[in-house]
Amino acid sequence: MTIQKNWQELIRPNKLQVTPGSDSGRFATLVAEPLERGFGQTLGNALRRVLLSSLQGAAVQSVHIDGVLHEFSSIAGVREDVTDIVLNIKDISIKMQGEGPKRMVVKKQGPGTVTAGDIQTVGDIVVLNPDLQICTLDDGAEIRMEFTVNTGKGYVAAERNRPEDAPIGLIPVDSLFSPVRKVSYKVENTREGQILDYDKLTMTIETNGAITPDDAVAYAARILQDQLNVFVNFEEPRKEVTQEIIPDLAFNPAFLKKVDELELSVRSANCLKNDNIVYIGDLVQKSEAEMLRTPNFGRKSLNEIKEVLAQMGLHLGMEVPGWPPENIDELAKRFEDHY
């Protein structure tokens, strides 16, 4: 038994169906089937864990609020205390192409609500949920906040985001870097041929908009693939490719093409068929006089055939030594890519 049978004889999904949700950039349902029994649970659980923990994203790491020394402070004219403001800042969704850290600033006077859309971004930073409310200002109140944004993966607690040389007033924030917000999956039975107990894996995915759900699954699968490579302790035997030996022909391979493959009128094609002319090799050996003696074959059909043959560099009345070959049907199949 060859080692390849361990994986080559397992059934693999013949399709991956992606159904976008109401917001195609954030929601989607993916269905993979058929899978070997048990593989739906295995793949679904592994992909879900990687999707939630291991994809790269961007998030706020810390914030500095003018006039605030620590997160247990309050700000005159701001209805929320700093603790609530920090909790709201955690929910800001960000897309950033380059490497961090980078800065964002928001500055606003009351009365009114400060939203994520008020943040002044620079470079390649995009705020994905601009309607998110950060705080509410009374008349005459003013606030200025400076955010530090960075890239990472998974969840990082606020204490880990505090630099050793953090200045007074720098407030670290819990960072949820993962662009994937929710993942659920279910496994059902599906049918393949006469077998009814294969697995059907359905995954429902929600992202923050920094990545599409199907791209997120693709990256997660690539991460798993890369991590599993270390467990493969062998090289696959190379398949021996035997090159087919094409025999030399004593005539043009185009003669092996059937005349019904030519673009002829129905009348001309029927006349050739009734005269038992099957291959071009049969046709080119005929003279014009012989063709005109064919029942229902007239000058118009003759001119049509002469024109088609001329386009191939052929003509009527040719001599074809060795025609027809004994194994003509076999040769026609072997040379079908050569004419």
Swiss-Prot record:
Residues 251-339 are annotated as: Alpha C-terminal domain (alpha-CTD). InterPro entries: DNA-dir_RNA_pol_insert (IPR011262), DNA-dir_RNA_pol_RpoA/D/Rpb3 (IPR011263), DNA-dir_RpoA (IPR011773), RBP11-like (IPR036603), RNAP_asu_C (IPR011260), RNApol_insert_sf (IPR036643). GO terms for biological process: DNA-templated transcription. Residues 1-235 are annotated as: Alpha N-terminal domain (alpha-NTD). It catalyses: RNA(n) + a ribonucleoside 5'-triphosphate = RNA(n+1) + diphosphate. SUPFAM superfamilies: C-terminal domain of RNA polymerase alpha subunit, Insert subdomain of RNA polymerase alpha subunit, RBP11-like subunits of RNA polymerase. It comes from the Bacteria. Its EC number is 2.7.7.6. Keywords: DNA-directed RNA polymerase, Nucleotidyltransferase, Transcription, Transferase. One of its GO terms (molecular function) is protein dimerization activity. SMART domains: RPOLD. CDD domains: RNAP_alpha_NTD. One of its GO terms (cellular component) is cytoplasm. Coiled coil: none annotated. Gene3D superfamilies: 5' to 3' exonuclease, C-terminal subdomain, DNA-directed RNA polymerase, insert domain, RNA polymerase, RBP11-like subunit. Belongs to the RNA polymerase alpha chain family. DNA-dependent RNA polymerase catalyzes the transcription of DNA into RNA using the four ribonucleoside triphosphates as substrates. HAMAP family: RNApol_bact_RpoA. The N-terminal domain is essential for RNAP assembly and basal transcription, whereas the C-terminal domain is involved in interaction with transcriptional regulators and with upstream promoter elements. Homodimer. The RNAP catalytic core consists of 2 alpha, 1 beta, 1 beta' and 1 omega subunit. When a sigma factor is associated with the core the holoenzyme is formed, which can initiate transcription. This is DNA-directed RNA polymerase subunit alpha.
